[in-house]
Regions:
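Short, well-structured alpha-helical interface segments that form or flank functional binding sites
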Residues: 93, 124-131, 185, 264
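A residue-level signal for conserved active-site and pocket-lining positions in enzyme catalytic cores
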Residues: 36, 67, 132, 190, ...
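Broad hydrophobic/π-residue packing in well-ordered secondary structure
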Residues: 40-42, 109, 125, 132, ...
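Metal-dependent nuclease catalytic cores that hydrolyze phosphodiester bonds in DNA/RNA
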Residues: 1-106, 113-127, 137, 150, ...
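Metal-dependent nuclease catalytic regions and adjoining charged, substrate-binding loops involved
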Residues: 2-7, 135-292
Length: 292
């Protein structure tokens, strides 16, 4: 991967964030398994052509630094332990931040946005935690609980004072119990995903199915019932049919279509430029400057 330095960051920082391949050949990490098949394959095939800018890696660097600090603290738990299990031709891997052997609690440190807490968007963390728990069970260690300790990098004391439903501290803890049924479902999810990835590798870049709506962080198109002279919508509907009915009932004058977005494709996918779905559906055409 090529690391650019558009903001002229110190070379020491650029050297630190310059990426090496996340997965060794033939391995899939717990976090990689959460990505779409298309992203996984394109990232692997085009790794040496991908670009990232050093300035975009500031927050991931904070996360790395925090993990490093916590790893060095002395307690009875073991930290940054790697586990792996062979599944067909792939080795599934995971690195556990902290494991309390006495209480069988797995802990993971996160640096994230306050909005993740506000939206209650923890499905990916749960899948990651259960994958770790499954890996550990295959290696002879039981996990009764997964606990994610999140540092909220954009927390605002002012907002916390104003809004009782806003996270009141810059730390949030998400945890859940691990059941045998969870582990069985996790193994099935992992094996199904690996079969899907294996099939995707047999196809050309453009022939691989697009990532799912969930994997693209896609939002649906909405239909806003508007009224002349009013800035905000009378109502925002999920379909044009509902919007037309609301327009008639509420005295609206027009319907404003608000297209859905694939937010990960637009702003966060590292291999978007090699993806035909991104090129055809997300990428905005370049504007041509006409000489005066």
């Amino acid at each position: 991967m090529i690391t650019t330095n558009k903001m002229h960051m110190p070379q020491a920082f650029v050297n630190f964030v310059s990426n090496t391949r996340h997965n060794a050949p033939g391995t899939l990490s717990a976090t990689t398994l959460l990505q779409g098949d298309k992203q996984i394959v394109l990232f692997d095939r085009h790794f040496d052509e991908l670009e990232q800018d050093a300035a975009d890696l500031v927050w991931p660097t904070f996360g790395t630094a925090f993990h490093s600090v916590m790893e060095k603290q002395n307690d009875d738990a073991f930290k940054e332990e790697a586990f792996s299990v062979q599944v067909d031709r792939w080795k599934v891997t995971g690195r556990v931040d902290r494991y309390d052997l006495e209480n069988e609690v797995l802990e993971d440190w996160k640096t994230t946005s306050v909005w993740k807490v506000i939206y209650g968007d923890f499905k990916d963390w749960k899948a990651q935690g259960l994958t770790y728990a499954w890996l550990m069970k295959q290696n002879g260690l039981n996990v009764q609980k997964c606990r994610f300790v999140a540092l909220l990098k954009d927390h605002s004391k002012t907002e916390a004072k104003r809004k009782p439903d806003y996270p009141q501290k810059p730390v949030f803890i998400y945890e859940f119990d691990v059941t045998e049924a969870d582990l069985e479902e996790t193994e099935e999810r992992i094996r199904t995903k690996i079969k899907s990835i294996t099939e995707a590798y047999k196809l050309g870049d453009d022939d691989i199915a697009p990532c799912t709506d969930e994997e693209r962080w896609a939002t649906a198109t909405k239909y806003a019932v508007m009224k002349d002279g009013r800035k905000t919508a009378l109502k925002v509907c999920d379909s044009m049919t509902d919007a037309e009915a609301c327009k008639e009932a509420m005295g609206g004058t027009r319907i404003e279509v608000r297209p859905g977005e694939s937010k990960k494709c637009a702003d966060y996918c590292p291999c978007a430029e090699f993806c035909n779905f991104y090129r055809d559906n997300v990428k905005k055409p370049e504007t041509e400057t006409v000489p005066m």
